[in-house]
Amino acid sequence: MPDMGVFLLATQAVAPPGELLNLALNAGAIAPEGAVLVAMLATLLVDLAGEQAAARWVPPICYAGLGTALVLLAQQWNAPLEPSFLGAFLADNLAISFRAVVALSTLLSLLISWRYAEQSGTPIGEYAAILLAATLGAMLLCGSTDLVSVFVSLETLSVASYLLAGYMKRDARSSEAALKYLLVGSAAAAVFLYGASLLYGLSGTTSLQAIGLALLTSPTPLAALSLVFVLATVAFKIAAVPFHQWTPDVYEGSPTPVVAFLSVGSKAAGFALALRLLVGCFGAFDNQWKLLFTVLAVLSMTLGNVVALAQTSMKRMLAYSSIGQAGFVMIGLVCGTEDGFAAMVLYMAAYLFMNLGAFACIILFSIRTGSDRISDYAGLYQKDPLITLGLSLCLLSLGGIPPMLGFFGKIYLFFAGWADHQYLLVVVGLVTSVVSIYYYISVIKMMVVKEPKEASDVVKSYPSIKWSTIGMPPLRIALVGCVVVTAVGGILSNPLFQWANNAVAGTPLLQEAIALGSQRSIG
């Protein structure tokens, strides 16, 4: 049985010989996902008791489940690596980092969801359960090391995301967004399955490590074709150009808290998938997939930031902004160095807070005004200084203005790219960062510079606001927390980068890829 021999060879790097029982199960590796699953089931049971019981008990159940998951993830950090479920899942530091980003994005998305759901008349029990299901799929995807577990996790995330996008059934735009997302996502899933079938046919196994070993020993044109199919699926999940067409329409039509989760949690899972598949499986085609991702990164940074200039809707502007941000993260992926991977992890953590902070401000503004138009923010500083300050800081961080957290995230990415001689990516990144600063600053100027007589009609009729730190509602807690981390995180960038370096150092997959890349550069 040659495939079993390849399988054992692939798993010896992470599991001592003879520990086949741990290799077969080791269910403790998915204990954080178990906490999320228990919270999801409890949410569904509470929802059966009625809307009043759900409104009272669903939020604390979600907080408890996600909080427990984060604690369990912290306990797994730097723990001995033991593959789970016959090598289908591995809780290395890379998986822990991305799973933590996903869990935190869900927690913050829920904090900014309750008020929105209450005003729109959305049943929060069903909504929270579906969001937790998407979280479960995304977290499992971050640690999946087998084609079967990758596909099951990917579809769990995708199906839950389709339901979330169309959750506002009375809104035609939400239904349209869900339909578009479903059609494009189904096509991406079919393409992935075709690529996975080619990989299985070429290697005789579904283990990603074993597939990587098989392709290293005998690369074939069919393997290159499977690379194209897999890369298309990854590009769809991270909304890279030219696989981005669904993003603006889905972001505009979906409920805003759902967009917040899709822009961070789903994207983080997509980049974790990219690392597992491209670095783990296609080491034999390292130059080819890096060239393709270089093209995707240049297109994403350019189109995402240029088209965002013309947007009049805040959600559409942030949709195109997220496409550009994905291009920045791809710089670290293309580098394939320790600094590149670490900068990639750091920027995803920074993006979590600055993007969700911006969405928290947008949701609070839309709840009070019912508007999403950028022009309606004119003169907002007169009526709501906190939203103005919070949104301004988050947008400045997204643009890479010092001393915000986003500035240091981009600097680390650009330094890693320059050190790896990725001059084209760095130059395009710098130019498009300047372009992004223009449309971010234009929103800030709209809010701050306008005279009282030039304020929009929406702001003129803005309700009076009384801020108090005592008994702050969840939406304001999320807003203040994200803004504080975004503003102060730049000061703590060195410890954060050390954490990101530890994530890379504790991941054998990335260390092997770095060593292989060094050998090729020397040779």
UniProtKB/Swiss-Prot annotation:
InterPro entries hit by this protein: NADH-Q_OxRdtase_suN/2, ND/Mrp_TM
Organismal lineage: Bacteria, Bacillati, Cyanobacteriota, Cyanophyceae, Synechococcales
Protein name: NAD(P)H-quinone oxidoreductase subunit 2
Membrane topology according to the record: Multi-pass membrane protein
The organism of origin for this protein: Prochlorococcus marinus (strain MIT 9313)
Role played: NDH-1 shuttles electrons from an unknown electron donor, via FMN and iron-sulfur (Fe-S) centers, to quinones in the respiratory and/or the photosynthetic chain. The immediate electron acceptor for the enzyme in this species is believed to be plastoquinone. Couples the redox reaction to proton translocation, and thus conserves the redox energy in a proton gradient. Cyanobacterial NDH-1 also plays a role in inorganic carbon-concentration.
A Gene Ontology biological process term: photosynthesis, light reaction
Primary location class: membrane
Statement: the UniProt record of this protein carries the keyword Iron: no
Reactions catalysed according to its record: a plastoquinone + NADH + (n+1) H(+)(in) = a plastoquinol + NAD(+) + n H(+)(out); a plastoquinone + NADPH + (n+1) H(+)(in) = a plastoquinol + NADP(+) + n H(+)(out)
Gene for this chain: ndhB
Keywords: Membrane, NAD, NADP, Plastoquinone, Quinone, Thylakoid, Translocase, Transmembrane, Transmembrane helix, Transport
EC number, as in UniProt: 7.1.1.-
Enzyme class: translocase
Annotated transmembrane regions: 29-49, 57-77, 94-114, 123-143, 147-167, 182-202, 223-243, 255-275, 291-311, 317-337, 345-365, 389-409, 424-444, 477-497
